[in-house]
Swiss-Prot record:
Gene name per UniProt: rph
GO biological process: rRNA catabolic process; rRNA processing; tRNA processing
Provenance organism: Bdellovibrio bacteriovorus (strain ATCC 15356 / DSM 50701 / NCIMB 9529 / HD100)
EC id: 2.7.7.56
Its biological purpose: Phosphorolytic 3'-5' exoribonuclease that plays an important role in tRNA 3'-end maturation. Removes nucleotide residues following the 3'-CCA terminus of tRNAs; can also add nucleotides to the ends of RNA molecules by using nucleoside diphosphates as substrates, but this may not be physiologically important. Probably plays a role in initiation of 16S rRNA degradation (leading to ribosome degradation) during starvation.
Name of the molecule in the record: Ribonuclease PH
Stored Gene3D superfamilies: GHMP Kinase, N-terminal domain (3.30.230.70)
Keywords linked to the UniProt accession: Nucleotidyltransferase, RNA-binding, rRNA processing, Transferase, tRNA processing, tRNA-binding
Family: Belongs to the RNase PH family.
Length: 243
C-alpha cells in the first residue's frame, strides 16, 4: 500500500472535463489526482511552410506551467525554449501525431496548448492524455463543418508514468513518489498496444530487462484504463481497438 492509499498498479483519481474553452476548437481539463492540466486545440487552415505541396498536415504542441502551479512561484518561460519546456512540448507533439493520419488531415495544422494549473507529478503524461481529447474534439468539430473531408483519427493515445522503488513497480507517480523513486519511466501508447514513446532513467539503481518488461505491462494496464476515460467524454468519435 502506498502513502496515498493506492495499490501499486492503481491510477490516481482520473477526471477529464471536455469543452471547457469557449473559443478553442477542442478543449479539456485533465486531472491525475492533484495534477491538473488545461489542454486546448487551435485549428490553422494552412500547414507549416515546409509541408506546403505535400498534401500532409501537422500536429504540434506547446507546454507550460503557470507560475503558481507549484508550491513556490516559478518564472514564466516566455520564450518557450527552456530545456524541460521544449522537451515536453516535443514529446506531446510526437505523441499526438501518432493519433492522426496526417495525409487525411490535409495541409492544415492543429496546435495543442497544455497549461499546467496544478502540478503533483505526471504533468507530461496528463498533457498527452488530455491533449488527445482536445485534439479529437477539435477534429470532430472540423469534420462536422466540412473544414476537413474525413475524420483522420487512427489511434487513441494516452501516457502514464511508472516507477521502480526498492524492487516494487508503481503506476502513475505523484510528486513525492517521483522525487524518491529509483527508476522513473514514461510510456506513451496507442489503443492497439503500440508504443509511441518510452522514456526511462535509473536515478539510483539500474534496472533489469525483466523489470523493464514488467514495467511495460503495468504501463499498458494504466494506458488502457485511460483510453476508457478518454472515450467516456468524447462520444462516438472513434472506437477503442478491441473494445
Amino acid at each position: 500500500m502506498r502513502a496515498d492509499g493506492r495499490l501499486f498498479d492503481q491510477l490516481r483519481n482520473i477526471k477529464i472535463t471536455p469543452n471547457v474553452s469557449e473559443y478553442a476548437e477542442g478543449s479539456a481539463i485533465v486531472e491525475f489526482g492533484r495534477t491538473k492540466v488545461l489542454c486546448t486545440a487551435t485549428y490553422e487552415s494552412k500547414a507549416p511552410s515546409w509541408l506546403l505541396g505535400t498534401g500532409a498536415g501537422w500536429i504540434t504542441a506547446e507546454y507550460g506551467m503557470l507560475p503558481r502551479s507549484t508550491h513556490t512561484r516559478i518564472r514564466r518561460d516566455k520564450s518557450m525554449t527552456g530545456g524541460r519546456t521544449q522537451e515536453i512540448s516535443r514529446l506531446i507533439g510526437r505523441s499526438l501525431r501518432a493519433a492522426v493520419d496526417l495525409k487525411q488531415l490535409g495541409e492544415k495544422q492543429i496546435i495543442i496548448d497544455c497549461d499546467v494549473l496544478n502540478a503533483d507529478g505526471g504533468t507530461r503524461t496528463a498533457s498527452v492524455t488530455g491533449g488527445f481529447v482536445a485534439l479529437a474534439l477539435a477534429l470532430k468539430k472540423l469534420h462536422a463543418v466540412s473544414e476537413i473531408k474525413t475524420l483522420p483519427l487512427i489511434n487513441y493515445v494516452s501516457a502514464i508514468s511508472v516507477g521502480l522503488h526498492e524492487g516494487q513497480i508503481l503506476l502513475d507517480l505523484n510528486y513525492d513518489e517521483d522525487s524518491a523513486i529509483g527508476t522513473d519511466m514514461n510510456f506513451v501508447m496507442t489503443d492497439k498496444g503500440q508504443f509511441v514513446e518510452v522514456q526511462g532513467t535509473a536515478e539510483h539503481v539500474p534496472f533489469t530487462r525483466d523489470q523493464l518488461f514488467k514495467m511495460m505491462d503495468v504501463a499498458e494496464k494504466g494506458c488502457r484504463e485511460l483510453f476508457i476515460h478518454q472515450a467516456s467524454v468524447m462520444g462516438e468519435i472513434y472506437k477503442i481497438a478491441g473494445a
